[in-house]
Regions:
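Oxidoreductase cofactor-interface core, primarily capturing Rossmann-like NAD(P)-dependent enzymes
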Residues: 1-25, 36-39, 46-48, 57-64, ...
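Periplasmic-binding protein-like
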Residues: 52-54
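Cofactor-binding loops of NAD(P)H-dependent oxidoreductases
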Residues: 31-33
Length: 201
């Protein structure tokens, strides 16, 4: 996302746990940042108008870390949040990830910040890793289908939204977009695709 936006000449602040790992891009400034650290997050977001918020790493404290970041953004004066959420986000979901994203969305709605929620589906890049060492995909999928989306497509979509906002376009204010792939596949069909690509059953 940062590289897409940088090609459009937008000034960027990159909040990172380790600023030394920031990509070397013109007109970009790396700031030390940590999920769950309110003071550090406020400092990193000082002067930021639009925050692109990606979820924290999976952990028992992820939900609270998200809420801390939302609070920090509000206190720091961030005007808009573009939040990378999840396609099935819902408070009553049996899927922990979906509940966490729904709680985060609600917290953002309760602030004075404008928001855009990008609810992406499962990443297609993840599908190659879902089989275990024996080549078995184990999970409660049954006959369910999923339209996986490429991380590259999600990054491009996020960059397009943020660039629009930076140009003063308000059409994305308080909007929710669901990002999916073009094909809805069962896990049996996904397994067949992986077999064709890798040559392994």
């Amino acid at each position: 996302v940062a590289r897409h936006l940088n090609t459009r000449g937008l000034p960027l602040i990159l909040p990172l746990r380790n600023p030394a790992k920031a990509p070397v891009l013109p007109n970009c400034e790396a700031q030390r940042f940590a999920y769950g650290d309110l003071e550090l997050a406020e400092q990193a977001l000082n002067g930021v108008d639009v925050l692109f918020m990606v979820s924290a790493a999976e952990s028992p404290t992820r939900e609270q870390e998200h809420l801390t970041l939302v609070q920090a953004a509000s206190v720091a004066g961030v005007k808009r949040i573009v939040y990378l959420s999840f396609a099935q986000a819902a408070l009553d979901s049996t899927f922990t990830l979906a509940r966490t994203h729904a709680v985060t969305e609600n917290a953002i709605r309760q602030t004075n910040m404008r928001y855009t929620f990008l609810r992406d589906n499962f990443y297609s890049e993840m599908m190659a890793t879902i089989a275990n060492a024996d080549g078995i995909i184990a999970g409660p999928a049954d006959d369910g289908r999923v339209a996986c989306v490429s991380q590259r497509d999600v990054a491009q979509a996020a960059a397009n939204v943020i660039a629009d906002i930076a140009c003063g376009n308000h059409r994305h204010d308080n909007q929710t977009y669901t990002l999916t792939g073009s094909q809805s596949l069962s896990f049996a069909e996904i397994a067949a695709v992986l077999t064709k690509i890798t040559g392994k059953p």
